Swiss-Prot record:
It comes from the Bacteria. This is UPF0260 protein RPE_1881. It holds the Pfam family CxxCxxCC. It comes from Rhodopseudomonas palustris (strain BisA53). Belongs to the UPF0260 family.
Length: 170
């Protein structure tokens, strides 16, 4: 009979509270992603101000229903300008949503109730209205670059009211 695996300690379960981004294992780093896919939306930068504008157009590799990459392992080959998040760049990427777990941990803040590491449920990011599910209007390549300005939206920079709650609504 196989030994029953030991339950991780509370400290191990809450690794994002005790470790820096640099100290995290590869598995911990990957699990920090909440699966919202907001970072997978096409963005435009104003040449005059440097301000970043989100659109509701997804990367060509985005599975808009699952809110994940269709080929995560090969994303950089298929989309050369895909930004691979690292402990160094999450501190400098101004376009990361304020709700992004990488950004929160880098700023010394805790995760929201809807984050799968907190809730234990990968669907809470969708229930809270944080993910892009149901909001993507098209994918890269379906809309011309000239038309992208017509698809600028503000919601990716905002946090829905129910997501701001201290705990999961009943």
């Amino acid at each position: 009979m196989a030994a029953v695996p030991k339950r991780p300690s509370q400290q191990q379960e809450l690794f994002w509270k005790t470790k820096t981004l640099e100290q995290m294992s590869a598995a911990e780093w990957e699990s920090l992603c909440d699966g919202c896919a907001r970072c997978c939306l096409e963005k435009l930068e104003c040449e005059d101000t440097g301000r970043i504008y989100f659109t509701h157009i997804g990367c060509k590799m985005l599975d808009a229903e699952a809110c994940g990459c269709k080929d995560y392992a090969n994303r950089s080959k298929k989309v050369p300008d895909c930004v691979r998040l690292t402990p160094a760049n999450v501190r400098t990427l101004s376009w990361l949503p304020s709700s992004c777990a990488y950004r929160l941990v880098a700023e010394g803040r805790d995760l929201y109730w809807w984050h799968p590491l907190v809730s234990g449920d990968p669907d809470t990011v969708h229930e809270a209205g944080v993910s892009v599910r149901g909001r993507v209007e098209g994918l890269e390549g379906e809309v011309s670059d000239a038309e992208l300005e017509d698809h600028i939206v503000s919601w990716p920079t905002l946090l829905p009211k129910r997501a701001k709650l201290k705990k999961r609504p009943a």
